[in-house]
Curated annotation (Swiss-Prot):
Its main location: secreted. Pathway: Glycan degradation; xylan degradation. It comes from Gibberella zeae (strain ATCC MYA-4620 / CBS 123657 / FGSC 9075 / NRRL 31084 / PH-1) (Wheat head blight fungus). One of its GO terms (molecular function) is endo-1,4-beta-xylanase activity. Residues 1-19 form the signal peptide. This is Endo-1,4-beta-xylanase B. The gene is XYLB. Keywords: Carbohydrate metabolism, Glycosidase, Hydrolase, Polysaccharide degradation, Secreted, Signal, Virulence, Xylan degradation. Optimum temperature is 40 degrees Celsius.
Length: 228
């Protein structure tokens, strides 16, 4: 059963602390210039799954596609921002199953991660995280009780930030952050999308949607498998 709770008042939105747009292959030569690195992802299809990987510090991370929906990411040195994972393009309201080993040391997320267009929105359904809870730095919009836990619904705004539509765009980030952390389970994305809509957070046309591991100026390792 899904239950919703919404707030009638909230604090001002702030820029999300960890936001990475369309995720860069670390075994390629790093491009010149930070902006180019930030807007040049590696994407494709691997074993029937869409994948996306992005980093602004190629020397600090290794991303590997495995069999089926499996992928792994190792990052170190407490440097840079890295996001990688597998899923689908386009995204949709689907139930996503996942399992694996997620071991962050510092600021990191394990999340269903995606984008929409018209409006341009970056979204996270955070299943696990390291030392920083992203809902603590965003405007609280409500709660959803589903899949054995309460998720905090929040929104933040990015100004002149890299996105799937260019390197200097203003857009909102939608968040559902699970209170009872886990590294395996299933995510009913449609329930989260409906909860966001009832909280006034509208999505557009789906671009890609992946189970992602993100690390920001931290270290860690993860091997995950996604299916749907």
């Amino acid at each position: 059963m899904v239950s919703f709770t919404y707030l009638l008042a909230a604090v001002s939105a702030v820029t999300g602390a960890v936001a990475a747009p369309n995720p860069t292959k670390v075994d390629a030569q790093p491009p010149s210039g930070l902006l180019e690195k930030r807007t040049s992802p590696t994407t494709g299809v691997n074993n029937g799954f869409y994948f996306s990987f992005w980093t602004d510090t190629p020397s600090a991370v290794t991303y590997t596609n495995g069999n089926g929906g499996q992928f792994s990411m190792n990052w170190n040195g407490n440097r840079g921002n890295h996001v990688g994972g597998k899923g689908w393009n386009p995204g949709a309201a689907r139930t996503i199953k996942y399992s694996g080993d997620y071991r962050p040391n510092g600021n990191s997320y394990l999340a269903v991660y995606g984008w929409t267009r018209n409006p341009l929105v970056e979204y996270y359904i955070v299943e696990n995280f390291g030392t920083y809870n992203p809902s603590s730095g965003a405007q609280k919009k409500g709660e959803i009780n589903i899949d054995g836990s309460i998720y905090d619904i929040a929104v933040s705004t990015r100004n002149c930030a890299p996105s799937i539509e260019g390197d200097c765009k203003t857009f909102q980030q939608y968040w559902s952050v699970r209170r009872n952390k886990r590294s395996s389970g299933s995510v009913n994305t449609g329930a989260h999308f409906n909860a966001w809509a009832q909280a006034g957070l509208r999505l557009g046309s789906h671009d890609y949607q992946i189970l992602a591991v993100e690390g920001y100026q931290s270290s860690g390792q993860a091997t995950m498998t996604v299916s749907g």
